[in-house]
């Protein structure tokens, strides 16, 4: 695109780490259209086949563990230990999604009554928009994306504008593992790109991790049902509510302050 995102090293802003395009509303519409057309064939694949593609992707990330950690150090300013942990967590998220999807593939039994055979079966939703944060640029997007892919959905990932290269490496690994190009797509950009993706009537589910204001705006936008839709959008929004900290009046502030900082930015 004519516009671009320069991803720079937070510790040395003059050092360019990566350059990404900015997806326009037209790019969003094209991505959703391609995902919509490709998704039924992906959903028809045996769950084991989808799982194998994701397992291969996880192994590719494992083989590039140190390179991916180095990218986070440069792109997001993460300490080495935290960057390495983020890569490891991304691998864990993908493998966990595979395990859970396979356990759900044959459905789950429900209460059985005389003359009835009751069973719960899960079906793919369709097109999933995954919007990830900058501070865990591989682990959280991997979890958002892998659960959708493993269960037969097409996924469009909008990475944080501060970490487009990490999002690109995740999509690369998934495609090299065997996920079709139209089933996993990357749409880098700013808030306008995410807003266009959320508002598109062809999107069925939105998985988001980030700030409370953005999360609430996503919930409001998803509730606005277009006449072009035949479905109600579902939203999974994690907005940092787990980070509340209570400090008693008799606490040692010299100990509290570094502990709070560590808890906010570490595993």
Show the residue positions of the predicted features.
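Hydrophobic face of amphipathic alpha-helices that form TPR/SEL1-like repeat modules
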Residues: 1-19
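Hydrophobic packing residues within well-ordered alpha-helices of enzyme cores
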Residues: 94, 167-170, 197, 218
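A structured beta-alpha segment of the ubiquitous adenosine-cofactor-binding alpha/beta core
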Residues: 117-118, 185-207
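Short beta->alpha connector loops at strand-helix junctions that form conserved
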Residues: 158-160, 188, 248
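Conserved small-residue-rich beta-alpha loop and adjacent elements
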Residues: 107-181, 254
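ALDH superfamily catalytic-core signature
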Residues: 178, 199, 213-267
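Glycine-rich loop-to-alpha-helix module at the N-terminal edge of alpha/beta enzyme cores
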Residues: 13-105
